[in-house]
Amino acid sequence: VIELNDRETLINTLSPFSSSEISVASIIQSIDKLDKLSEADVIQELVSKGLPNDKASDALSAIKNAKPSSNLAEIIESAKNLGVSESTLRFNPALARGLDYYTGMIFEGKIPGESGSVGGGGRYDRLIESLGGPSIPAVGFGLGFDRTVEVMQTKGLLSATQSTQVLVTIFSPSLQGPTLKVAQ
């Protein structure tokens, strides 16, 4: 399952709850923990950051009822038009991936019945520039290799190690020694 959200949805939904005491970025960081903490714990964290209890509850309610931005809705529609099944895509209005450098779409790959994600990423238009490079919009993702292998083993998707035949050629007499070592 691919969970999707975008910064526009997060910022537009949660900005009304920010103040001089608590930034929208800080609210987003707390909301992003909804997959790990209870709603009561997230509300308590928001209150500890300076958001009044009623506003913290309202922020949580607002994000749970948020709709995708027009940009994200277009991305979801494009994915469907490319043959991605509707059951594979899930809008998650609380998904933020905990990083402020995302500027557009955000996504995480999850395996149904398993906790955590096996990968994630998104759009980050200013990241390369912030690291001293040119101003280049970018999209990227990271795959949790260990997590992916763990899930594949749990689900019996990895076959036992098998030997295979390999042809190793010697391109030059001077490479005969190293080539024979590789062949072993």
Give the residues covered by each predicted segment.
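Positively charged, Gly/Ser-enriched RNA/tRNA-binding surfaces
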Residues: 2, 6-12, 17, 35-184
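Short secondary-structure capping/junction motifs at helix and strand boundaries
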Residues: 1, 21-25
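EAL-type cyclic di-GMP phosphodiesterase domain
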Residues: 24-33, 176
